[in-house]
Each structure stands twice: as C-alpha cells, then as structure tokens.
C-alpha cells in the first residue's frame, strides 16, 4: 500500500472478516454480514480493510470494492504454530492471556499466554457434527435441539445425539482451558457459553484484533 493512509477514528473505515460462508463487517461498533451475492447492495463508501480465509469470497469482495486492502501482512503474532488461519490470529491478537474459542463452521480453540500463542486444536462446528451423524446412519439424522443442561442423561436418540455433540465440544474446551478465562466468538458462542462458567462472549473479538493490527501498523491512530 503506497504511502499508507492513517485514520484517527474508527468511523472512517470498515473492517471486513471474509469467512467460508458469509462476509462479516464492522463499521465503528455496528456489526453486519452479507452473502457474496449481496455485497454490491451494501454500497460501502468508506475504506475497507479485510482478512480472508476464502479465496472465492475474497474475489467477490474485490470485484465490488477493488480498493479494499488485505491486512494479513500488517502484524505479527508470536507463535510456533504452522498454518494458523488469519481469523484465528486476529482473535488471538485481541487476548493477552486466556483461551480463544471461535465457534463457527469449525470450532477452533487456542491458548494465549502473555501475548504468545501456545497452540490449539480444531473441532467440527455443531452443524458439521449433525452432517456427520446424518452420513453415519439414518437413525442418527436428528434435528438440532438446544440443551439446557449436561447434568441430565438423555433418554431419546435425538437428545443423545445432541448431548454427545455438545459434551464433546465442552469437554475439549474445559480440558484445554483448565481455570483460564475463555473468550468465545462465532455463531454458536452464546449457546456454548451457557456451559462454560469461566467464559465471556466477545462478538467483536476478530475485529478487536484487526483494530490492534491496524494500530501496530500506524494506520489507525485513535485510542
């Protein structure tokens, strides 16, 4: 980016997180999302800074907003992990100590200590669990039912499928987190947080990390 422009107010730019299914935006503290087919209708006039994990959706954004800038190279997250996704990096950048859980199409769990990424793991997202059950056996093709508690054992196939799915995710998070604070983001964050007493939902976590990256690069100068 030639002679990087700097901004003193978040209101003057738009942050964009390009996912595998939808494209998410943050303008100041307003969050919204779009399918790739609807991007042009948004009519965004401000400078767009983005990250992307999906090449096709990234091309769709650039077709509509050719001046949008990829900020993947604007920062460094201390880690020995090879191939850490840019969305995971941004979420981790926003946390100094704790466990970051992004509960989207996949569920990623990452440990951060004093700003360093220690490692993490990846689980299927809740929707992917349902898809896997469906492929395994017809009787396991059950609709998702939100559970109120994991303390009561299931007494139906539908409840058993949902119980096993949710418990496997919660148990993995708790095993890695121990007593550390858990920061949740992604579409299923609020649901999972009900089973995790040391957790807090941070809907803007990835965007918070993007703000930090822009500040480190001298592009965003507001406090």
Swiss-Prot record:
Cellular component terms (Gene Ontology): cytoplasm
Keyword NADP: no
List of residues binding K(+): 102
Consequence of substituting residue 87 to E: 3% of wild-type activity
Regulation: Not regulated by feedback inhibition by CoA and its thioesters as described for many other pantothenate kinases. Not inhibited by N-pentylpantothenamide (N5-Pan), and this compound cannot act as a substrate either.
GO molecular function: ATP binding; metal ion binding; pantothenate kinase activity
EC identifiers of the protein: 2.7.1.33
NCBIfam families linked: baf, PRK13333.1
Oligomer status and interactors: Homodimer.
Protein name: Type III pantothenate kinase
Organism: Helicobacter pylori (strain ATCC 700392 / 26695) (Campylobacter pylori)
